[in-house]
């Protein structure tokens, strides 16, 4: 029971912080309770703890609550020393600069993909997401790329046990069809989705390993623009893949 309570408290803390991000302004205890679907008494205890640790402060006017910059300082300290991003960031930035499209870096976490980095494109109309967002393996291009890194038997076993919900009318929901697609994509060296996760978005990706970690990197944008620039984008993506592989070789050679 104690373990379950600790997990619930951790989840509520994250919900509270995300509520402030969505509200973009101070919130009262009543507003917090409504937004995170939690009793006011529990919210009060949570806010008092965060206040004591310096993560939120209370405004005298209407007793509203807002996070301090301590959270930002902690997050920045963590981000500065990310074992993967600090090494990959320059290559990702160059990829976005050369294509103008949104660049995604992701890693498989059991039955889904988590975005480790998102560098939004420079176009007015672009694909948007955030680091920490999760996507299904079967309907995201990085999901497919990371599936492609697995041994065939291991991949088949994973696909057999995970759900394959239809996210859009274009989502591949047949297990055999998905496995066949992954096999073909792995053989040619790149992966794609066309409106499978978001109806009007296309993404192409490649996979690579660095420091023994399997990752996927993708370019994503509107289907029309991605199709028009497909050859150039894929060539640039393969260049980034080669740069990642060279970086990994330099680490292994030490």
Residue spans for each PLM region:
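Amphipathic alpha-helical effector-binding/dimerization core
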Residues: 62-161
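N-terminal helix-turn-helix
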Residues: 1-81, 85, 242, 246, ...
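Intrinsically disordered, low-complexity polar/acidic regions
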Residues: 167-168, 199
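Short, structured helix-loop boundary elements
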Residues: 6-10, 29, 64, 68, ...
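A structural signal for short hydrophobic beta-strand segments in well-ordered beta-sheet cores
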Residues: 56-58, 105-106, 208
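Amphipathic alpha-helical regulatory segments at dimerization interfaces
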Residues: 35, 46, 87-98, 104, ...
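Extended hydrophobic
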Residues: 174-243
């Amino acid at each position: 029971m104690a373990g379950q309570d600790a997990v619930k408290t951790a989840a509520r803390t994250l919900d509270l912080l995300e509520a402030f991000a969505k509200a973009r302004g101070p919130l009262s205890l009543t507003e917090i309770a409504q937004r995170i679907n939690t009793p006011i008494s529990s919210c009060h205890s949570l806010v008092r703890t965060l206040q004591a640790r310096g993560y939120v402060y209370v405004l005298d006017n209407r007793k509203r609550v807002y996070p301090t910059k301590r959270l930002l300082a902690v997050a920045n300290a963590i981000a500065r020393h990310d074992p993967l991003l600090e090494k990959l960031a320059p290559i990702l930035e160059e990829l976005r600069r050369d294509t103008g499209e949104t660049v995604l870096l992701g890693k498989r976490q059991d039955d889904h993909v988590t975005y480790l980095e998102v560098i939004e494109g420079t176009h007015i109309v672009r694909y948007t997401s955030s680091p920490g967002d999760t996507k299904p393996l079967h309907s995201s291009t990085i999901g497919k790329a990371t599936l492609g890194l697995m041994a065939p038997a291991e991949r088949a076993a994973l696909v057999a046990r995970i759900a394959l919900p239809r996210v859009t009318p274009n989502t591949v929901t047949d297990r055999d069809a998905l496995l066949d697609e992954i096999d073909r994509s792995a053989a040619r060296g790149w992966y794609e989705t066309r409106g499978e996760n978001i109806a009007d978005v296309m993404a192409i990706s490649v996979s690579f390993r660095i420091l023994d970690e399997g990752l996927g990197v993708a370019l994503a944008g509107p289907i029309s623009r991605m199709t028009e620039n497909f050859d150039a984008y894929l060539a640039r993506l393969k260049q980034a893949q080669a740069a990642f592989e060279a970086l990994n070789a330099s680490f292994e050679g030490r």
